[in-house]
């Protein structure tokens, strides 16, 4: 899997070179309007380059030129597995891990691996006990931003991300992105055993178990097996009695989010949270 090499083309490359030479003269402010295919506008302010389209600031001209691909629609990095293209190399590399299964980010505390550094940093809060996200409504704190957002919606019932195709709305942008695959018919997950493709990773993972006939997560108390670690965690509460979801109206606690959500729905007058 490798990026396309045609990139911005010779016209933009020459323009970038000229811009760098002009900036090196020491001008504090440099504006450049290109009439080429990219139609970009670059601004040099002090030691930074600012994009006139969105206001993003960069310390290198090369970074700004690369950023401009977002606005021009240029996507030089193409996945050879599924044909999906990306304007940024970092997004391309991250996408490729879907096909390769690579998870280069490892937790030094427990050995769990992740395909993104941001996921590792988020996971590490489990070990540190850090809860940086505080609800302004009730004061409850959370380790994960996603959980914090989900909790906040129990107060507002707001779903910010709407699908332009069917009108369905979601709490998270990631949920909307996942949903959009229904309309685009994208199936980025391919089984290496039989070649079957899937829209969602969860379905792909369950399918892969039909080849291995395994449920890797087993309860030490009763021996029941699960496909996912979070399913085992949820099941374990039936043995430990842990109830992490608390209704602030009645100070009632729940072991499962579904039960907590049902209780919250009662308080909200029957609205879906």
Swiss-Prot record:
Its main location: nucleus. A zinc finger (C2H2-type) spans 49-71, 77-99, 103-127, 133-155, 161-183, 189-211, 217-239. GO terms for cellular component: nucleus. SUPFAM superfamilies: beta-beta-alpha zinc fingers. Keywords: DNA-binding, Metal-binding, Nucleus, Repeat, Transcription, Transcription regulation, Zinc, Zinc-finger. It is found in: Nucleus. PROSITE patterns: ZINC_FINGER_C2H2_1, ZINC_FINGER_C2H2_2. GO terms for molecular function: DNA-binding transcription factor activity, RNA polymerase II-specific; RNA polymerase II transcription regulatory region sequence-specific DNA binding; zinc ion binding. InterPro entries: C2H2-ZF_Transcription_Reg, Znf_C2H2_sf, Znf_C2H2_type. SMART domains: ZnF_C2H2 (SM00355). Pfam families: zf-C2H2 (PF00096). Coiled coil: none annotated. May be involved in transcriptional regulation. This is Zinc finger protein 80. It comes from Pongo pygmaeus (Bornean orangutan).
């Amino acid at each position: 899997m490798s990026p396309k090499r045609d990139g911005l083309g010779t016209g933009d490359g020459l323009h970038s070179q000229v811009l760098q030479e002009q900036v090196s003269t020491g001008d504090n402010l440099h504006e450049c309007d290109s009439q080429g295919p990219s139609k970009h506008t670059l601004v040099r302010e002090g030691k930074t380059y600012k994009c006139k389209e969105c206001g993003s600031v960069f310390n290198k001209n090369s970074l700004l030129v690369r950023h401009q691909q977002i606005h021009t629609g240029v996507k030089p990095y193409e996945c050879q597995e599924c044909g999906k293209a990306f304007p940024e190399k970092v997004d391309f590399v991250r996408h490729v891990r879907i096909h390769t299964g690579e998870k280069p980010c490892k937790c030094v505390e427990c050995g769990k691996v992740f395909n993104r550094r941001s996921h590792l940093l988020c996971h590490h809060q489990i070990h540190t006990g850090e809860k940086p996200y505080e609800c302004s409504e009730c004061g409850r704190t959370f380790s994960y931003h996603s959980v914090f957002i989900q909790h906040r919606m129990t107060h507002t019932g707001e779903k910010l991300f709407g699908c332009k195709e069917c009108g369905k709305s979601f709490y998270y942008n990631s949920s909307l992105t996942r949903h959009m695959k229904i309309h685009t018919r994208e199936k980025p997950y391919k089984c290496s055993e039989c070649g079957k493709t899937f829209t969602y990773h969860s379905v792909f993972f369950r399918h892969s178990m039909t080849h291995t006939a395994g449920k890797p997560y087993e309860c030490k108390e009763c021996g029941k097996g699960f496909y996912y670690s979070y399913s085992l965690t949820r099941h374990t509460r039936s043995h430990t009695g842990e109830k992490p979801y608390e209704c602030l109206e009645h100070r009632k606690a729940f072991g499962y989010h579904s039960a907590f959500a049902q209780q919250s729905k009662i308080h909200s007058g029957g609205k879906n949270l």
